[in-house]
């Protein structure tokens, strides 16, 4: 979910796994609809599409935005093709070559109908002589011609609304990682466009641990996190799966590039790991041990403060945002 905002503060929110408060981007849909924002439902059965190949003139601060776009497409292909070892050097070479080929028409005449789609990359790979190119094309085939072709379309939704929510709830486990990576790139495009207009952009990334769990996407995601901040973006990562977040090699880079961390109630094992990672004293840990709703620790620079946030339950905003099963049912009836 993103919106222009005059402020600059990146945050990481850590929440305990379990309970009725499910961390899912779909939870934001009622709020976004109420605020007249745009909810984009991304699923195999949806008719709303975003094109992973989208690019704009402001995509990079360098003279050639295609180099940065090629880096994203390599990350996408690594997730699809790479396996544990990632892409082979020859595979990276042919992908990069094809990326430059398929964008020639668009940069010669940058109109929407000239924007390439995933199928253009697939076809360009098939035209290369190297067997590695055909291997990559075969891996991409299911995403182009097969049952997972939801990202083989041009963008047909309004991504320029003040508030945009990308709903990926119905994506399967493997497609969700791919979907999150593509959404991240879409948001980057919005950050660059807002920056050229003198606006900041807030970006809330739920289930962030999924992007840090895979080596193929973790390094790119951390680089994007840093770049967001530099370009006037205000990224906020949220997770209930603290173990997976902390197991990532890149988590230290995320913490180092986060101005503020909000920590709610934590499980015993997670508390000890977080205490070591963030230098939390035993007394401070007590504030995230069996703590109540809206209670925890706030980290801002070198300062650690306990907090209590009691959100009024008689407000319309509360009824829209609550994820408690009984209250959601009552809200729907009203």
Enumerate the predicted regions with their spans:
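C-terminal regions of RecA-like/P-loop NTPase motor modules
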Residues: 242-334
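Short, low-complexity S/T/E/D/G/P-rich linear segments that nucleate or cap local secondary structure
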Residues: 1-4, 11
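H-loop/switch region of ABC-family ATPase nucleotide-binding domains
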Residues: 239
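P-loop NTPase motor domains
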Residues: 26, 30-37, 44, 51-233, ...
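Short, charged, surface-exposed secondary-structure boundary motifs
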Residues: 48-54, 270-275
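Short, acidic/turn-prone active-site loops that include or flank metal/cofactor-
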Residues: 44-47, 266-268
């Amino acid at each position: 979910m993103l919106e222009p905002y005059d402020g600059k503060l990146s945050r990481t929110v850590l929440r305990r796994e379990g309970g009725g408060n499910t961390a899912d981007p779909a939870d934001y849909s009622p709020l976004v609809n109420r605020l007249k924002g745009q909810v984009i439902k991304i699923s195999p059965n949806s008719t709303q599409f975003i094109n992973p190949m989208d690019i704009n003139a402001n995509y990079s601060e360098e003279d050639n935005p295609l180099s940065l776009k090629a880096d994203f497409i390599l990350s996408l292909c690594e997730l699809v093709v790479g396996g544990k070892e990632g892409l082979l050097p020859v595979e990276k070479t042919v992908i990069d070559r094809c990326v430059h080929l398929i964008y020639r028409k668009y940069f010669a005449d940058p109109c929407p109908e000239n924007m390439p789609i995933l199928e253009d990359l697939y076809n360009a790979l098939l035209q290369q002589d190297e067997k590695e190119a055909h291997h990559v094309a075969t891996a991409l085939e299911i995403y182009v011609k097969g049952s997972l072709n939801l990202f083989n379309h041009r963008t047909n939704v309004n991504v320029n609304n003040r508030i945009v929510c990308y709903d990926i709830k119905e994506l399967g486990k493997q497609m969700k990682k791919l979907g999150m990576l593509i959404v991240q790139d879409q948001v980057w495009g919005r950050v660059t466009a807002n920056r050229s207009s003198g606006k900041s952009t807030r970006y809330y990334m739920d289930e962030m641990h999924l992007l840090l769990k895979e080596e193929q996407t973790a390094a790119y995601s951390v680089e994007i996190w840093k770049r967001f901040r530099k370009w006037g973006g205000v990224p906020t990562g949220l997770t209930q799966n603290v173990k997976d977040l902390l197991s990532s090699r890149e988590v230290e880079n995320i913490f180092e590039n986060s101005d503020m961390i909000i920590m709610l109630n934590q499980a015993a094992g997670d508390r000890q790991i977080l205490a070591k990672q963030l230098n939390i004293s035993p007394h401070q840990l007590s504030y995230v041990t069996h703590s109540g709703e809206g209670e925890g620790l706030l980290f801002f620079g070198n300062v650690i403060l306990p907090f209590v946030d009691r959100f009024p339950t008689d407000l319309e905003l509360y009824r829209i945002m609550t994820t408690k099963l009984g209250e959601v049912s009552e809200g729907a009836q009203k």
